[in-house]
């Protein structure tokens, strides 16, 4: 039996670049700095650009080229109700995306058994627990990446990147015995190392999402 192409809806987590004002050059410079801090995480990653706070005319071709120079792939704009601007963005190759309140992601019924890794996760390695929690009974080196659709438990030092709730589960958490991360992320919201308050550095912590913002708590047990 011949199989045919099938078009289905799906959910993806996308980074959003919020332009705070009309100074697009400054925003692109900031983006370039962020990408330089975690190039393997941002390389060829799709990004949506929120232009809600931009009042002046936008050269969408230059904006697209500027984002591409950072190594990310601009896929769309949001925060724009002006039909003329929407048409200009479309002509430049952007999709026009409307904001919506996403439905709560419920995965518990589909979750698989926890994935357990006993060996160190070395630089350049990536471990992904699809539809599952991930337990690392060792250290995560700089340049390594651990990803889970559920929560991540690291019984060692996290020096690389930890990405929990990769499919959008905001209830996901990250636990680690010694936080020295290059990046922590839950449901698409992320902090780079310079955003992590030094009081949590080298500490036993729990990372959660509260009202769409990352929160870190020190664990005393």
From Swiss-Prot:
Pfam families from the UniProt entry: MinC_C, MinC_N
Family assignment from sequence similarity: Belongs to the MinC family.
Full protein name: Probable septum site-determining protein MinC
GO biological process: cell morphogenesis; division septum assembly; regulation of cell division; regulation of cell septum assembly
Originating species: Aliivibrio salmonicida (strain LFI1238)
Keyword Cell division among UniProt keywords: yes
HAMAP family noted in UniProt: MinC (MF_00267)
Keywords, ordered alphabetically: Cell cycle, Cell division, Septation
């Amino acid at each position: 039996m011949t199989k045919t192409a099938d078009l289905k809806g799906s959910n993806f987590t996308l980074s959003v670049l919020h332009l705070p004002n009309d100074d697009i050059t400054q925003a692109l410079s900031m983006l370039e700095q962020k990408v330089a801090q975690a190039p393997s995480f941002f390389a060829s990653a799709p990004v949506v650009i929120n232009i809600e706070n931009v009042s002046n005319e936008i050269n969408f071709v230059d904006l697209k080229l500027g984002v591409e120079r950072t190594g990310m792939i601009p896929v769309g704009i949001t925060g724009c109700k002006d039909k003329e601007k929407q048409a200009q963005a479309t002509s430049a190759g952007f999709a026009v995306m409307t904001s919506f309140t996403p439905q709560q992601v419920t995965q518990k019924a589909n979750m698989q058994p926890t994935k357990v890794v006993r060996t160190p996760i070395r630089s350049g390695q990536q471990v992904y627990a699809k539809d599952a929690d991930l337990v690392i009974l060792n250290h995560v080196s700089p340049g390594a990446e651990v990803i889970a659709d559920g929560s991540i438990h690291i019984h060692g030092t996290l020096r690389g990147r930890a990405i929990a709730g990769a499919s959008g589960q905001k209830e996901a958490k990250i636990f680690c015995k010694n936080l020295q991360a290059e990046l922590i992320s839950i449901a698409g919201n992320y902090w780079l190392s310079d955003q992590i308050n030094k009081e949590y550095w080298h500490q036993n912590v729990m990372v959660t999402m509260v009202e769409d913002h990352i929160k870190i708590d020190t664990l005393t047990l």
